[in-house]
Amino acid sequence: MVLKSSEFNPDFPKQIIESGEWIFGDHASSFQKCYQCGTCTGACPSGRITALRTRKLIRSALAGIDSILSGDDLWMCTTCYECYEKCPREVKITDIIKIIRNIAAEKGYIAEPHRKTSLLVFKTGHAVPVNDEIKKARLAIGLTEIPPTTHKYPEALEIVRDIMEDLNFCKKVGICRETMDLEPLNVQKSEE
């Protein structure tokens, strides 16, 4: 695949660093140490069953190829930290992927499964709501049927929802409080 010069954003690596510094500190610039050995890709369990190539994501970030923001690969990472632990250059790959995801989300690019999980958190307070099977499993290991979370204390769910709205999370993900459903996202195209 041949790329045109118009497909490169020379400010993209800097944008990644600046977007992530306030959370990850110096780790936000660690991707600049990557020498493309491929250890991360070899270690990635998601990459064994999906098209995710961690090394390619990092290479694209370094090269300023910001089209990765709209791609599916960015959302295939399970954040297991296997690449993070194996990297010989101590590139904080999982953190870099989280930073790039945040940039993508700001522009309206969020994988649909992630949006649906966010909606579950908004509706129930949980990414994986308690069902009958989970209740049985909890009882079998000596726990109460309902965990001491929003399932047991439904009044806390409104607090969770308020926090999500106060952080503009609902707007970014496209959650409508009135319909309790997802709305289409407004995608911000890069300036060309």
Curated annotation (Swiss-Prot):
Record has tRNA-binding as a keyword: no
GO biological-process terms attached to the record: methanogenesis
Keywords assigned: 4Fe-4S, Iron, Iron-sulfur, Metal-binding, Methanogenesis, Oxidoreductase
Enzyme Commission identifier(s): 1.8.98.5, 1.8.98.6
Catalytic activity field: coenzyme B + coenzyme M + 2 reduced [2Fe-2S]-[ferredoxin] + 2 H(+) = coenzyme M-coenzyme B heterodisulfide + 2 H2 + 2 oxidized [2Fe-2S]-[ferredoxin]; coenzyme B + coenzyme M + 2 reduced [2Fe-2S]-[ferredoxin] + 2 CO2 = coenzyme M-coenzyme B heterodisulfide + 2 formate + 2 oxidized [2Fe-2S]-[ferredoxin]
Listed GO CC annotations: plasma membrane
Pfam family, one: Fer4_8
Obligatory cofactor(s): [4Fe-4S] cluster
Annotated cofactor note: Binds 2 [4Fe-4S] cluster.
Any one GO molecular-function label of the UniProt entry: metal ion binding
Enzyme class of the recorded protein, top EC level: oxidoreductase
Endpoints of the signal sequence: none
All residue ranges annotated as the 4Fe-4S ferredoxin-type domain in the record: 25-54
Binding of [4Fe-4S] cluster 2, residues: C44, C77, C80, C83
Gene3D superfamilies linked: Alpha-helical ferredoxin
Similarity-based family: Belongs to the HdrC family.
NCBIfam families given in the database record: CoB_CoM_SS_C
Oligomer status and interactors: The heterodisulfide reductase is composed of three subunits; HdrA, HdrB and HdrC. B1 and B2 subunits are interchangeable, as are the C1 and C2 subunits. The heterodisulfide reductase forms a supercomplex with formylmethanofuran dehydrogenase (Fwd), F(420)-non-reducing hydrogenase (Vhu) and formate dehydrogenase (Fdh).
Function statement: Part of a complex that catalyzes the reversible reduction of CoM-S-S-CoB to the thiol-coenzymes H-S-CoM (coenzyme M) and H-S-CoB (coenzyme B).
Name of the molecule in the record: H(2)/formate:CoB-CoM heterodisulfide,ferredoxin reductase subunit C1
Organism: Methanococcus maripaludis (strain DSM 14266 / JCM 13030 / NBRC 101832 / S2 / LL)
Encoding gene, per UniProt annotation: hdrC1
